[in-house]
Amino acid sequence: MYDGGIEKIVNVCASVGGFQDTVKLMEKYPFVYGAVGIHPDDADKMTQETLDEIRRLSHMDKMVAIGEIGLDYYWHKEEDEHQIQKKMFRAQLDIAREEKLPFMIHSREAAEDTLNIVREYMQGGMYGGIIHCFSYSREIAAEYLKMGLYLGIGGVVTFKNAKKLKETVQYAPLSQLVLETDCPYMSPEPNRGKRNSSLNLPYVAQAIAELKGITCLLYTSDAADE
């Protein structure tokens, strides 16, 4: 991994099954860190025991965030599903606040509800976070940026039809953009459709640098310092 210029990786949980996989990777590789949480698609499967396990794992030295948490209404159209997702989103944000960890948020077709909940928690005091694979408008981005949050940018920024995301990248401060993979999904051009990995990050960094009118070396250096 070091040969690709990648020095550190955060492996992000999305399900209970991913908890121990992340722990094993953290223990095996010194450059792998973890984020622990449950994706909104599995919110209806969560119990108090699940939340207790998230809290327990958050105490590990190399567990650096709570995530991937949030709201996803793309497949979940019913109001009762939305209510369950919001309840578990809040429960995991509570853990992030109490354990003094940043969060990593997934939001799909749920822009307003996600923004309202995040704004509520940020006003109450949080330790920052990332809006993972940001896909909403520049106006929504502005609200998150004002709260001091980061926008996660992945392979989609290299796609020709990603006009909205490219406008957001041009608008957002470089200091609030974070490189992401969403592995194994969202491989950037020229590897679109193939399995993604952190080795594809240079393509994402290059696309962002071109949109910003700077060199890729300058961008990645600043991001690493941040």
Locations of the language-model features?
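Divalent metal-binding pocket/active-site signature
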Residues: 8-18, 45-48, 55-147, 167-168, ...
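Short, acidic/turn-prone active-site loops that include or flank metal/cofactor-
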Residues: 37-40, 135, 155-159, 183-184
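Active-site hotspot residues in diverse enzymes, especially metal/ion-binding acidic/histidine motifs
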Residues: 203
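Residue-level signal for inorganic ion chemistry
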Residues: 1, 22, 34, 68, ...
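Conserved small/polar residues in nucleotide/adenosyl-binding loops
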Residues: 220-226
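Residue-level marker for buried hydrophobic side chains located in beta-strands
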Residues: 65, 177-179
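His/Asp/Glu-enriched short active-site or ligand-binding loop at hydrolase and phosphoryl-transfer sites
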Residues: 148-162
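Divalent metal-dependent hydrolysis catalytic cores, especially in the metallo-beta-lactamase
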Residues: 1-41, 64-67, 102, 150
